[in-house]
Amino acid sequence: MIEVEQLSKIYGSTPAIADVTFKVEPGEIVGFLGPNGAGKTTTMRILTGYLPATSGTARIAGYDVHENSMAVRQRIGYLPETPPLYPDMTVEGFLHFVARIKGVAAGDRAGQVNWAIKRCNLLEKRRVLIRKLSKGFRQRVGIAQAIVHDPPAIILDEPTVGLDPRQIIEVRNLIKSLAGSHTIILSTHILPEVSMTCNRVTIINRGKVVATNTPEGLMAQLTEGSGYEIEVDGDRDTAVELLRNIPGVSRIELLPVSYGAENRAGVRVISATGSEPGREIAAALVSAGVGLYEMRRTTASLEDVFLELTTTEKVETDASSEASNKPESGEG
């Protein structure tokens, strides 16, 4: 449904995105994830025809975004980060206006508007001026204008930003209800939304795609992150020294302990990839006479994956930059 191949956008000599490649299959919800400034919005604007690419191709429903821009726009619904709403129109009036400019036939407009209103749970607000709506309801109107012409592909840029927890849940459920009959790209930097909403995730950092997989697949690929949180009695240094010598232990982090537990120490043990040293950890502590109050298994989260991929990429890029700027031997 959506195919992006080696897409690049350069401003002057500065690349906003470079060789971005990914696919979204029909009916999928794909999270487009990255830190602020990673290139998410630039990619979304190219896909929706708002911005031309410097090089590369993007196709939606078989149509090239550059060569068949109008055909693409007829087949997508777009919710930018700031919804394009007219505050002095009613919800229903605004959606009729959008349906008309998006080419919905006159005889079908009322039905499409009613469908979008029902789908977005706006029945009680249909005759209310948009300026009187809460941010959560405005976001629903923004999604309604994106789907009123029933497009096969929907592109949502930060759809839950600025919403309160209840509004986030409502918008999340709405997006999930659109899956199957629509193909959705969800651009965000809010990690919980991705794991709760999306079938697959594409992570972009510094303008480049660094990973594409299911949320579960990404967590399984993490080089480290799973492990154990342990609370022990007595000398933490002794416990740490014991843990360092256990095969399969990759890293140890010190943790704060709960209030009123002055004699206890908290430790997080990060396991090496493919290792499960839990039994060895417990045996070593008990054999050494270290009091073991609690030992809890932990697993890598999408946040761990995100931090590893984006931080590693930044470190590698910075290191390369320093190397390239380093004077050659013999230079003064």
Show where each model-derived region lies.
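ABC transporter nucleotide-binding domains
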Residues: 2-4, 9-205, 210-211
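Hydrophobic/anchoring residues in structured secondary elements
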Residues: 9, 251-254, 297
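Non-catalytic surface loops within mature trypsin-like serine protease
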Residues: 26, 124, 234, 271-273, ...
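Conserved protein kinase catalytic domain
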Residues: 73, 117, 172, 219, ...
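Non-catalytic alpha-helical coupling and interface elements of nucleotide-dependent molecular machines
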Residues: 100-103, 223, 227, 248, ...
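ABC transporter nucleotide-binding domain
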Residues: 172-272
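C-terminal coupling/interaction segments
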Residues: 268-332
